[in-house]
From Swiss-Prot:
GO terms for biological process: ribosomal large subunit assembly; translation. One of its GO terms (molecular function) is rRNA binding. Keywords: Ribonucleoprotein, Ribosomal protein, RNA-binding, rRNA-binding. The keyword Cytoplasm does not apply. Binds directly to 23S ribosomal RNA and is necessary for the in vitro assembly process of the 50S ribosomal subunit. It is not involved in the protein synthesizing functions of that subunit. The keyword ATP-binding does not apply. This is Large ribosomal subunit protein bL20. It comes from Methylibium petroleiphilum (strain ATCC BAA-1232 / LMG 22953 / PM1). InterPro entries: Ribosomal_bL20, RIBOSOMAL_L20_CS, Ribosomal_protein_bL20_C. The lineage of its organism: Bacteria, Pseudomonadati, Pseudomonadota, Betaproteobacteria, Burkholderiales.
Amino acid sequence: MPRVKRGVTARARHKKVLELAKGFRGRRKNVYRIAKQAVMKAGQYAYRDRRNRKRVFRRLWIARINAASRSHGITYSRFIAGIKKAAIDIDRKMLAELAVNDPAAFGSIVEKVKAQLA
């Protein structure tokens, strides 16, 4: 049975890891053993934060809607309750966009909500 030499496959594997570690600081970018650990940890952070991103953005939208609705004299919780009651089917992402980029449209929604709650 012939001897198997792993030079080509090892080189390819090392190259793949070192390319993923591009931009890292210190020896994490050019020492395979350290780069491999750094890439693994980066992957764990990426996996975790893809899930956290959804929470973070929802919190941001809620903060923006709350600020805009309070400037119109209504709290966030009453505003959301009024939207549900008025059967306005618009999500928090779009409400936050309106609050930031089109305050007049957001104001008209607030007026409809206030009328529904009164």
